[in-house]
From Swiss-Prot:
One of its GO terms (biological process) is peroxisome organization. It comes from Pyricularia oryzae (strain 70-15 / ATCC MYA-4617 / FGSC 8958). It is a peripheral membrane protein. It is found in: Cytoplasm; Endosome membrane. This is Vacuolar-sorting protein SNF7. Its main location: cytoplasm.
């Protein structure tokens, strides 16, 4: 039975929706007929006016009858024009009312749609979702920190290695400065000494080494002063 009542209800709603459209169609049809009558009466008025002018000097009775018919047509034309104006106003009023009704129906549908959407959402659900997002973001941050700290632990740097590397770098810079000034390292000077007796070689090597060291120290002091 509900389906039957729904069918009848649906037809009733459709009829209510079609009522203004049918009314507008009927009014426009009547307006079209009146506009045709307006043109016909205007032609009749022009025709009777021409007859009256034609017979005004030769046949006054005919001219008078033509003028009488002209007045009758003019009266009918005035009525027709009044009816046309009334119909046009009525059509505009129904069209405006129909637009208002359709606008209201559209707004009702929009309100129902928003009600359906908000019916599935509550402040508690939104807060719960946001809490879950914050928890997951915090968990992700903890995971990243754990991975990063683990990598840093596996790549621990020995301070002794750093000291050795710094000493090597300082030695390289010192060698470069010596090469630029034309004075070779002490070890190279010893290797270039001529062959001699063991005792003499040791004595000369010691003397050369001391002289070279003093010269090197003076050169470094001079460079530092600059």
């Amino acid at each position: 039975m509900s389906g039957v009542w729904g069918w009848f209800g649906g037809n009733a709603a459709q009829r209510r929706k079609d009522t203004p459209k049918n009314a507008i169609l009927g009014l426009r049809s009547q307006l079209d007929m009146l506009q045709k009558r307006e043109k016909h009466l205007q032609n009749q008025i022009s025709e009777q006016d021409a007859i009256a002018r034609k017979n005004i000097s030769t046949n006054k009775n005919a001219a008078k009858a033509a003028l009488k018919r002209k007045k009758t047509h003019e009266h009918s034309l005035d009525q027709t024009l009044s009816q046309i104006g009334t119909l046009e106003q009525q059509i505009n009023a129904i069209e405006s009312a129909n637009i208002n009704m359709e606008t209201l129906e559209a707004m009702k549908k929009a309100g129902k749609a928003m009600e359906d959407i908000h019916g599935k959402l509550t402040v508690e659900k939104v807060d719960e979702t946001m809490d879950k997002l914050r928890e997951q973001n915090a968990l992700s941050e903890e995971i990243v920190n754990a991975i990063t700290n683990n990598q840093l632990g596996n790549e621990a740097i020995d301070d002794a290695d750093l000291e050795d590397e710094l000493e090597a770098m300082e030695q390289e810079q010192l060698d470069e400065k010596i090469l630029k000034t034309g004075t070779g390292p002490v070890s190279d000077a010893i290797q270039r000494l001529p062959a001699a007796a063991n005792g003499e070689l040791k004595g000369k090597a010691t003397t050369v080494e001391e002289d070279d060291e003093e010269a090197e120290l003076r050169k470094l002091q001079a460079e530092m002063a600059m």
